[in-house]
Amino acid sequence: ALETLLELERNPRPWRKGLYVDPSNYAQIGGWTFDKEGHRTQLNFDTCYPMVKGDPGEATPVRIGRAREDTCPHCGCQMVDILVLDGRDERLKFLGLAGILTATCCPNCVGFLKGPAFNSFTLDGGVEVFPSELFDGAGKMDCYVRPEDYRSLTENPFVLGGAPMPLFYGAACDDVNTVGGFANWVQDWEYTACPHCGKPMKYLAQIQWDTLMDGTEGTLYIEFCPDCQIVSMQHQQT
């Protein structure tokens, strides 16, 4: 497949003019891409773990929805560490993270941004949230996340499952939260370019909003650049 797509990239056929994107884009649905020299880059991991409902107070190396004190500049909602992942756990060794990855966003605005939400992370748990812009260019928007919604989000029972699932488990189900493997893209697959180095980010996890808060829709996809230690979070829904 790589040889064929590289040939089409270097020598476009006449029918290319009728396509919206280059044929090479379709490699991404298989979880990989390549550069102009033909060097292949994997965009996902070949191991998939589910997030399952655990017992109250159960220890877990992956936490969804940890409360924060700071607030969103757009809507005033409390920010949230939507994913906190300790790569030192034996189950997560496949990620190649020698510490903690934290993904931070506004649970109200992350679906209304122009592009993904970004933050940098340090392996000791530190976070720096990048500035963001609302999709319509407005400076402010209403907050639709009620206090009881935020409490539901940050007190959810999910913990990392004890055993891996099939590689395409996350892609085949629209009601599961997963780490690794393939995503169930609501729309088209979308691998974000790292804002620092420009390389495509690697898919890390997906979170279904309706598993955390009643009355919500869509999926949050979390990707990261291991070299630059930057995380992206993007929302899709029907």
PLM feature segments, named:
Residues 1-238:
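Preference for intrinsically disordered or flexible, low-complexity segments
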